[in-house]
UniProtKB/Swiss-Prot annotation:
InterPro entries, sorted: Bchl_c-bd, Bchl_C-bd_sf
GO CC aspect terms: chlorosome envelope
Organism: Chlorobium phaeovibrioides
Leader sequence residues: none
Gene3D superfamilies, alphabetized: bacteriochlorophyll c-binding protein
Top-level taxon of the source organism: Bacteria
Gene: csmA
A Pfam entry, by short name: Bac_chlorC
Protein name, UniProt field: Bacteriochlorophyll e-binding protein
Positions of a bacteriochlorophyll e binding: H25
Length: 51
């Protein structure tokens, strides 16, 4: 699975969620939400194009 895309983003997010559970670093939570926001905007752009 190369070239990025939604599935890669989901795997990366899952890895970060697991990291939060294990380590308990709140900075990682902030990073996760930042990454999630970028992923959602990318999905919206792919779905609806540049509006």
């Amino acid at each position: 699975m190369n070239g990025g895309g939604v599935f890669t983003d989901i795997l990366a997010a899952s890895g970060r969620i697991f990291e939060v559970m294990v380590e308990g670093h709140w900075a990682t939570v902030g990073y996760l939400f930042d990454s999630l926001g970028k992923g959602v905007s990318r999905i919206n752009q792919n779905a609806y194009g540049n509006m």
